[in-house]
Amino acid sequence: MNKLSTIELSSTSKNLKLVDGNLYSYDGKRFIKYMGSSKNFTVPEGVETLVSRCITKSMTTLNLPSTLKVIEGWSLESMSGVNLLNIPASVTTMYTYSFHANTKLRVAEGNATYKSIDDVLILNKAGTKVIMASRNATTYNIPNTVTEIEKNAFYYCTKMISITIPDSVTTIGAGAFYSCSSLKEITIPQSVTSIGADAFLHCGNLTAINIKGTANRISGAPWGAQYGNRAINWNV
């Protein structure tokens, strides 16, 4: 659908509809495709879901409605140009791969599911889990309220140079640092007892995984690291 310039629907269609040339589900709850030429767009009230790849053009501003609940994977991943995206209080579901790499994310304070830290980290509302991160930062500092770095939390954070993991963290999920290709070194605190499969897969420059505590205390090494066990330094 990325190369479409116009969409025409049968006048009898009961599944889809066009509003100002843009494609929606017939009930208006799913935003399917932005076909406009303007770089500034407001998704209308009533929309509850942004469908995968609904906007694949360069934009300047995008305003999301107060009715929005779900931002599907890849929805805005190809939408470059928006420096800061405000996530409404109504949103309950979104993914790290929903957004373009250069877009900062800011969650409305009234959101009951998520909260943002410095427009970079997205945590659960309680602040105990890192859910995802904006991918345009070079330095990431995880607050000491966090106990878990979730699966794919730092997916494709290719600009990451350094990350600070506090002693409060006990779990690092599968693929947590997938394709953090600029990261050269990471220190795992003694509090961490579990690292998921492929946590460091495709981290091509990661040559030092420094783990505090006794050797081999965390199973599954080297967790997809390109340099294998040579990259792991126990008991640092």
Residue spans of the language-model regions?
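Short secondary-structure boundary/capping segments
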Residues: 22-23, 224
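N-terminal regions of proteins, emphasizing targeting and processing segments when present
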Residues: 173-176, 196-199, 222
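N-terminal module detector in large eukaryotic regulators
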Residues: 99, 222-225
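Structural signature of tandem-repeat unit edges
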Residues: 2-22, 29, 33-49, 57-70, ...
